Every structure is written in C-alpha cells, then in structure tokens.
Amino acid sequence: MPVITLPDGSQRTFDQPVSVAEVAASIGAGLAKATLAGKVDGKLVDACDKIDHDATLQIITPKDEEGLEIIRHSCAHLIGHAVKQLYPTAKMVIGPVIDEGFYYDIAYERPFTPDDLAAIEKRMQQLIDTDYDVVKKMTPRAEVIDVFTSRGEDYKLRLVEDMPDEQAMGLYYHEEYVDMCRGPHVPNTRFLKAFKLTKLSGAYWRGDAKNEQLQRVYGTAWADKKQLAAYIQRIEEAEKRDHRKIGKQLDLFHLQEEAPGMVFWHANGWTVYQVLEQYMRQVQRENGYQEIKTPQVVDRILWERSGHWSNYAENMFTTSSENRDYAVKPMNCPCHVQVFNQGLKSYRDLPLRLAEFGACHRNEPSGALHGIMRVRGFVQDDAHIFCTEDQVKKEAADFIKLTLDVYKDFGFTDVAMKLSTRPAKRVGSEELWDRAEGALADALNESGLEWEYQPGEGAFYGPKIEFTLRDCLGRNWQCGTLQYDPNLPERLDASYIAEDNSRVRPVMLHRAILGSFERFIGMLIEHYAGVFPAWLAPTQAVIMNITDKQADFALEVEKALNGSGFRAKSDLRNEKIGFKIREHTLLRVPYLLVIGDREVETQTVAVRTREGADLGSMPVAQFAELLSQAVSRRGRQESE
C-alpha cells in the first residue's frame, strides 16, 4: 500500500503499485491530461512507471523546466522516426537535448539538403498529428542487442557495448521505430506539437575528426506554440544581428579560406579593437597591474614542464628549427611564470599582478570555427596574480568589483557569477580545497550580489569563478574567469621568500575580464546590432556639406574634432544631403553634422543623431562638449 506524498504535503494511499499517470488521474482529469512524467523521491521517471513504495512525487507537466527537457528529448526521437520512414538506410546515432533545443546525429549515404530538412519536419508533424502513444519497454541487454542487430543500427550497437552490463535498458517505441534511452519521454506525441527543425551541420562520431563524418539535424521545441513563436522571433532578430553580416556592412573585418580562424581587421574594426585595448590598458594600470609582453613561439621543453604538451598538444600549432621543437603559445600562463621567476621575490613583492594582451593560437577544429566568435588566432586581456594564500580573498574581491564595473561600461548589467568547486579527480588536500573555495566564496559574498555553486566543475587543481553576461536577446555569454592555481607554480618552480626566510610557492590566480577580444567584439556587435555607443563607434561624427561652397568649413570642423581626440570624417561628395544622411545612418554613425550656407555664416553645425533626432544648430565647441559627454558615459547610457 504505497503512500504518495505530494509537494503540498498532502498524501494519497493506494492499494497496489501505482503509476505516475494513475496518481495524476486520481487528482484530476486536467492534471492527468497534462502529465508528462514524474519525479519520485527526486528522480525523474516516466508517467507509466510504477511506484511500489512510500514516496514523494512531483507531477511533471510542460510548464516545468524538466518537462521542457523531456519534450525536446522526445522530439529528438521523433526525428529518428521520421528519418527512418523517409530514408530507411539511414543509421541513427545519438539525439541529446541542448540549450533551447535538441539534435540528432545520423549516418547517411549523402548529405542532407534544406529540402530534406523540410521533408523531415513535415513527416514529424504528420506523425504528431496521429497522437500515438510512446511505449516504454525495459528490455534485457541481450534482447536490446538483438533488436538493433535485426534493424542494422550499427551505431546503437556500439553504444550498447560501452554501457554497463545492466539487467535491462529502456527502449522507447514510436510505433515501428525504436530508440534506446534512460528517459523519461512523453507518453504521447500530442505534447510535441510546438517544434521546429532549425538547421543542418556536420559532426563526427564521438566528436573525433579522425572518425567517420555524420550529419546533425538541429531543432527546437517548446511547451506551446506561443513560446515557439517567441523563440523564432528571437532567432530572427539574432540573425539580423549576426556579427558576420554586420561586420561586412560596417566594413569591420573579414575572414578567408587561406587563413581559417584568423581575422583580417579592417580600419573600422581595428578602431574598435584599439579602443578596447586602450580602455583595458587604462583599467589595468589604475588597478595595479604591470603590463608585459612574452614570446609567441616557445620551446616544447617549457610546454612539457607546464603539462600542456601532454594534455593539450593536439590543439597547439608546432614547428621545428635547428633540431628543436617549438609551439606557438595557446595560452600565456607558463610565460608569465617565467617573468615571475626572474630575480628573487619576497613576500613584500606580493601580490604581483602581471597583465598581457597576449596573442594566442589554438588549433580548433575547422567545423567549430564561427566568425570572430570562435577562432584560431586571438588576443586575451590576460593577467596572472601571484599572491600568498592569505591574499587570495582580497585579490578575488577586488577582481570581482573591477570585472563588474568593466561590464557596466560596455552596457552589461545582467551578470551571473558561479563558483566551480572541487571535481572528483583532483590534486591537493581537502584542507587546501576548503581554504581555496572558502576564500573565493567569501569574496563573492563580499560583492553583495547573488551567485551560485557549480559543484564538481572546478579544474583538477583548484576552484574558479565564472562570469556570464546576458545580452539584449537574453543569450548567455561566459566571459570573465578567476582560476585558483597552486599547480603551475609548483610545476614551473615559482617561489618567493616568506617572512621567516623560507621558500614558499605563491598561489597563481589566472584572470580575464573580456576573454578573447575577438569574441567580445563579436558579442558587442550583436548586442548593439552594430549601433555602438559613441565611445566605441569607429566614426563618431561625420560632417556633410550641402554644396561645394561649404567644403572648406567642413574640413575645418573635421580637423578641430580630430584635434580634440575624436574620430570624425567629412563627406564632401557631390551627392544630395538626404542621400548622405541615409548612407551614414545605415553605417550607424552616432552624430551627423550638416553644414549649409547658414552654418558657415554662423560658424555652427546642424546636429542630427543616427536615430533621427534633430538637436539643432550649435557651435563646434558646444558639439564637442556634447560628444565628450557621450563618450565619457561609455556604454552605461545604454543600460540605465
């Protein structure tokens, strides 16, 4: 007689084992119809699963976060059902849930086309409309092997081989189609109506480029059509903001096949890049960092000592010269330890903060490259703080405050902070981990802001803090990090003289605020849709004459503004003023200055904004003050 305790504390007693669906039906017909699955004693189970003991139960519906994940996972299985009907020789591989959607990897004799994608989606919709039940069968391993052998599903058999020899596995039947999964899944396809397939891409078996290539079908699914429509609208807006498209429109950068994953910065884009670098240089100088520069190409001996050669070699670009092996640095930290190691260091020298705009290169898979967001050559606002264990909390607290201030200057105020703690496989004593995690947690608490733990997500040698920004489309971008590291100083023999004259290893704090400049600029382009705040805009003001008679004064204004440290250009082309205004508005120039005969006579400029606001005529000095105020606000006016 199982006694079921519901979330509100009420209890229901049953005479025999009862399924989640039956419990829901005993509560009400509406809940029974909405039931996707259940959470029994905290564990997700299918709606058909029986409960044979006293237990707590939460009914999972599409309104729950877990419910949405179940819907998406079931949609992935539905791809399999549709694909096997349309392309019977296709081999199904895996179909997991991802952020806001799902995908299925498939082996097929030819690449799928957009027409195939449309056909698969149409067949999925037809299958959903039949409202068939999804049937779960717990099946002995030997029988599972027989099922997939008879169907020629080679990849499923390879997956079964990797799984522990359990008594039974979950097989989910979508009519004639069967897939293997831990579950849970929807009980009926009526829950899958709000879905859409989104794109095709390539993939590799087990994610290894040495293995056979597969095709990946992506999709998204939501609790209802309204949520799906909102998502599609958001994606369409994101496509309009695609940094690759805007980068071309604004002449910021380009990429080409001869240098995959390497950015060709044009004058406009390089201006934005330089503003970022100069800003971060000023910020770091004001906060006690020493800027250094370290070599690009370093002997493998250093990478062996640091551990990168054995753990990261496949991602490193290497070369040889005069019988010596070298690597182009994928990260800056080992080189920064070399700078620290020059000369004797005392505890009085700590904390020592070494910063570098370090150019790094990583041999990312070509299929993973994406515009300037995911590249092979990039620059980091990288720094390493060498300090004593007692100084960690203050250094971390100062870094948190600095990082949040920097993000505000770029218009980002929605920042999530997470503390990743000790993983199962780790080095160092429990006491060391306790102190390290405690120092970072205390620093986070000192900020007065909310943060959360990520248990087990730390590096094997130490905990870390991650900063995730949310942009105007609600997308999350992991940017800043603070990594506690006692390991690299040990490997590279870094030490300082303590107060008692003993040699002690420093703690090394790896930290970055923007991360990769390339990726951060890509984020800014999409966040602002290319409408950069005045301080970042490649051209801050354009001066336009109406006729040739005003050309000399236009050039005087340009010279005066540039002489005051602004970025101004004149447009003296023999075009109608309306044409010029439209063109520079499309180029997202913040301020458009028009000069006619009246402006020449009064020595003023007629000021318009790219948003179309007419600010009237004013002396050049007054406009310079207006522009100066806009620049000094940086991106904060965009977020306040």
Curated annotation (Swiss-Prot):
**Where does the record say this protein resides?**
Cytoplasm
Q: Which reaction does it catalyse?
A: tRNA(Thr) + L-threonine + ATP = L-threonyl-tRNA(Thr) + AMP + diphosphate + H(+)
Cofactor or coenzyme needed: Zn(2+)
Q: Which SUPFAM superfamilies match?
A: Class II aaRS ABD-related, Class II aaRS and biotin synthetases, TGS-like, ThrRS/AlaRS common domain
Q: Which residues bind Zn(2+)?
A: C333, H384, H510
GO MF annotations in UniProt: ATP binding; metal ion binding; threonine-tRNA ligase activity; tRNA binding
KW Protein transport (keyword) present:
no
Question: Where is region (Catalytic) located?
Answer: 242-533
Query: Which coarse location class applies to the principal site listed for this UniProt protein?
Result: cytoplasm
Entry coiled-coil feature ranges: none
Q: Which UniProt keywords apply?
A: Aminoacyl-tRNA synthetase, ATP-binding, Cytoplasm, Ligase, Metal-binding, Nucleotide-binding, Protein biosynthesis, RNA-binding, tRNA-binding, Zinc
UniProt key word Repressor: no
Which processes are annotated in GO (biological process)? threonyl-tRNA aminoacylation
Give the enzyme's EC designation.
6.1.1.3
Q: How is the cofactor bound?
A: Binds 1 zinc ion per subunit.
Name the Pfam families for this protein: HGTP_anticodon, TGS, tRNA-synt_2b, tRNA_SAD
Write out the similarity annotation: Belongs to the class-II aminoacyl-tRNA synthetase family.
Q: PANTHER family under this entry?
A: THREONINE--TRNA LIGASE, CHLOROPLASTIC_MITOCHONDRIAL 2, THREONINE-TRNA LIGASE
| Functional description taken from the UniProt entry | Catalyzes the attachment of threonine to tRNA(Thr) in a two-step reaction: L-threonine is first activated by ATP to form Thr-AMP and then transferred to the acceptor end of tRNA(Thr). Also edits incorrectly charged L-seryl-tRNA(Thr).
HAMAP family, from UniProt?
Thr_tRNA_synth
Q: Could you identify this protein by its name? A: Threonine--tRNA ligase
- Organism equals Pseudomonas entomophila (strain L48)
Q: Which gene encodes it?
A: thrS
